Amino acid sequence: EDISTMDKQAIPDHTLLVGGFPCQDYSVAHTLSSSHGIEGKKGVLWWQIRDTIIAKKPPFCIFENVDRLLKSPAKQRGRDFGVILACLAQEGYSVEWRVVNAAQYGAAQRRRRTFIYAYRNDTIYGQKMADISADMIIKNGGLMAKAFPIQNIGQITETVIGGDIVDVSDNFAFAFEAAGYMRKGRIYTSKVIEQEEEPIALGKILQKNVDDKFYITNEKMPKWTYLKGAKKIPRTSANGHEYVFSEGPVAFPDPWDRPGRTMLTSESTLNRSTHVVSDPGTGRLRLLTPIEAERLQGFDDEWTNTGMPDRMRYFCMGNALVVPMITRMGRVLDTIIAEEK
């Protein structure tokens, strides 16, 4: 069912609301019918999440987004995340967030994502956290610090966000760091030094002697070599300005002794971001198999083998979360929810 057309009150009551949503334009304006109402851009999923929160008031929420959410848009850094925080504050929630690189916490992929944890202030957990300082919540007392331990935090910077979401959309800007906490509109944020764990090297997840269809043919090798290599290309912008587009080389093949790069939905297609590995059995260059793509994200082998074509299996994995990162948050949240009963 389309979340944008359904009655949010018809959604069953729930303890935890979970969502992943694109980094879109979160700007808002007052509605034409009311100076108190607000209206976001059509098709922006966040507003459906907000409406669900208003209708159902779940005690806990966990959201996921790309790491650039904290710095977007480029012309008003921090506005988009500020709008999200203002919406949650308005509904009586406190918020923790962390930008997590999965490889730093034992995963097989260097994938940076922003995780957002919100909880109602009137929960048992919310009342308990009200007595803990912001720096302690960021360093070791909050859900994020328990799920993703850190060695230390940097200097905390603070700001206050107002309750008028349109004003936040029009005027708010702030340098959000990789970790932070908000309660009742007061924001605290800092850099962190992660307590790094040994990642899984790419070589550990590779299969041997895979099907011939995954190997790069001699005919396509020059194209792959070009895409992966450094290049400088003269270009002309729409207004006639001439410039040189340049990019450095990408490891070709991808090294076995490091975790994989961030997997995209285009994985396995002929493009610069696709992983190319040396097969452990034959030594020939090839693409990842669907099973290896699943392993990069921490899924069980054959998780996506439902009859869908390989192209869609890669697409699903390029869109997925790194499962062990969610497991880490889930274990902490299990304890929190158990104490509410």
Model-derived regions: residue spans:
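C-terminal target-recognition/interaction regions appended to catalytic cores
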Residues: 181-341
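Flexible loop residues that form catalytic
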Residues: 22, 66, 268
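Gly/Ser/Thr-rich beta-alpha loop segments that engage phosphate groups in nucleotides
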Residues: 21-22, 108, 320
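SAM cofactor-binding core of SAM-dependent methyltransferases
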Residues: 1-4
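Class I S-adenosyl-L-methionine
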Residues: 6-14, 26-252
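Short SAM/SAH-binding signature in class I
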Residues: 14-20
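Short aromatic/basic micro-patch
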Residues: 20, 60, 287-290
